[in-house]
């Protein structure tokens, strides 16, 4: 999986940072696709500066209904339709997301020429396609807000083709059945169990993408053991009380959570517009003093999961 940050500013855009949007490139050999997490104003324009086609976008996950995470959605939906894209699209989000989308389209005389499904979610598992699952966790914010945990299912281990050939199993369709863990029967009556010729399963990757939040009970479960955790660092340590009073987190709180959850990497985003480039490096240093494996997301930064 690959993360592409389209917007990394909190609340309002700046000259160098747009408001929140994160693209997830699934990069799966049998199922390509793009997922979008939040869609602040101007997201479709940010997408034009990447190599990705909106036609590949098939799922959008909205954390909450504040404008800096949402106001780009109607324009993206309409432009996708005007471009002749017919691939279905599913939007997941909190209560009210359906009313927002339908109202915006209705009063502007707009529509989509592709199937559009809107799923209003609660806490818990919201999606599983057999390759990966997505679970929503409630966060601490003035509006109903969720973070999303994306977990790939474990992949089957490699098939020991050399051992199978030595056992007299001809390559071809039988290998495919054995790779799926099935038992086959050879012409001489012998039974071959695929599980005996498979290496250990390859653990799937796990990713946690937080919406806006102050410290909360669900945060540790959302982030526990993930390879990559994306979390806001809206304000620095000196402004922690102000951040919390508005349902946001400081650098220290993001980094401490990453350490306690045992994540592989922390990526901080959603930084206040009060910070210029020098100020953002200050935020990064504060996080790294607690959790060294921290990176700062800028617009169009790409990270592998």
UniProtKB/Swiss-Prot annotation:
Cofactor: how bound: Binds 2 Zn(2+) ions.
Keyword flag Zinc: yes
InterPro entries per the UniProt record, alphabetical: Metallo-B-lactamas, RibonucZ/Hydroxyglut_hydro, Rnase_BN, RNase_Z/BN
Primary enzyme class: hydrolase
EC number assigned by the record: 3.1.-.-
Record's signal peptide: none
Cofactor dependence: Zn(2+)
Binding site for Zn(2+) 1: 64, 66, 141, 212
Keywords (A to Z) from UniProt: Endonuclease, Exonuclease, Hydrolase, Metal-binding, Nuclease, tRNA processing, Zinc
Gene Ontology MF term list: 3'-tRNA processing endoribonuclease activity; exonuclease activity; zinc ion binding
Residues annotated to bind Zn(2+) 2: 68-69, 212, 270
Any Pfam family the entry gives: Lactamase_B_2
Active site residues of this protein: 68
Family from the record: Belongs to the RNase Z family. RNase BN subfamily.
HAMAP family referenced in this protein's UniProt entry, alphabetically: RNase_Z_BN
Subunit description: Homodimer.
Stated role: Zinc phosphodiesterase, which has both exoribonuclease and endoribonuclease activities.
UniProt xrefs under NCBIfam families: PRK00055.1-1, PRK00055.1-3, RNase_Z, true_RNase_BN
Name of the protein: Ribonuclease BN
Organism name: Escherichia coli O7:K1 (strain IAI39 / ExPEC)
The gene coding this protein: rbn
